[in-house]
Regions:
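Active-site substrate-binding loop specific to GH73 endo-beta-N-acetylglucosaminidase modules
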Residues: 18, 45-51, 65, 101-264
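N-terminal accessory alpha/beta regions
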Residues: 1-115
């Protein structure tokens, strides 16, 4: 892309690339995502050998998933969608070493790919309720009786607002209460168990309501994030996509400025 210097040429290239269906790419069709069913756990009282075998299966599946994605990135004829998937994968960083279940990581990878060109709010909510992310940040231990702040804190600090940028410790605590009750089913689907959820009023960023995860995402982030996100911030995410080498930003300014809100 860096060889396309005239604005009109690279603009048409970008429009065509972003408008393409990633699943229709011949390279994508040639590299379907592997099926990675979660192996059956060894259970209580299992032998050392059975536990080792379970761990080996988990490790083998994670290796298979990693190798598949590398093949997909190399094989895709139009790499923009895989670059965007990688960009969001780096932004919503999740540790495969802790998650361990390749099925969770594979589902997250596909969400990032399918939502990579949509609005940031939709993507953020998908990650907020994602099995891999929930496992990584201990969201299953977040209950009305014993709130866990990990997910609420990381969502504000790393994924949306930025460290110390417009939220307080009380906002984190109230946000954690809004996120109580979520669990991961054996199928990898996530859901709320009502009796584990805090159904009392919470006050987040000065707004009081009986917030759940959706309300937290709506009230606890978008309006403030739109004010606090700069064109340069969106531009810094965009620049690695066309080329590794640092380029003058003037040509990208009209597009990055238009997406500076990074919201709905």
């Amino acid at each position: 892309m860096h060889r396309l210097t005239p604005w009109q040429d690279w603009s048409k290239y970008v429009d065509a690339a972003l408008g393409a269906d990633p699943d229709a790419d011949p390279g994508a069709r040639a590299t379907p995502m592997p099926t990675l069913p979660a192996p059956r756990g060894p259970g209580k009282g299992a032998s050392v050998a059975a536990r080792k075998e379970f761990n080996r299966q988990l490790s083998d599946q994670m290796t298979e998933l990693s190798q598949w994605w590398l093949r997909r990135m190399v094989t895709a004829q139009q790499p923009i969608h895989e670059k965007l998937t990688l960009l969001w994968h780096n932004h919503f960083a999740t540790s495969a070493q802790k998650v361990r279940f390749a099925a969770y990581m594979a589902a997250q990878n596909q969400k990032l790919r399918s939502l990579s060109l949509g609005d940031f709010h939709t993507l953020a909510y998908a990650m907020l309720t994602d099995a891999a992310m929930m496992h990584w940040l201990d969201a299953q231990t977040n209950t009305a009786k014993a709130p866990n702040e990990n997910l609420a804190r990381e969502f504000m600090e790393l994924f949306t607002l930025g460290h110390g940028n417009g939220y307080t410790e009380d906002d984190v605590r109230q946000g954690a209460r809004a996120l109580t009750g979520w669990v991961i089913r054996p199928t990898g689907q996530t859901m709320v168990v009502p009796k584990r959820h805090d159904r009392t009023a919470k006050t987040i960023f000065g707004v009081t309501g009986n917030f759940d995860a959706s309300g937290f995402c709506d009230t606890g982030w978008p309006s403030r994030n739109r004010r606090n996100t700069s064109p340069d911030g969106c531009g810094s995410s965009w620049r690695p996509i066309p080329n590794r080498r640092r380029r003058r930003s003037t040509a990208l300014s009209p597009r990055t400025a238009a997406t500076a809100t990074c919201g709905r």
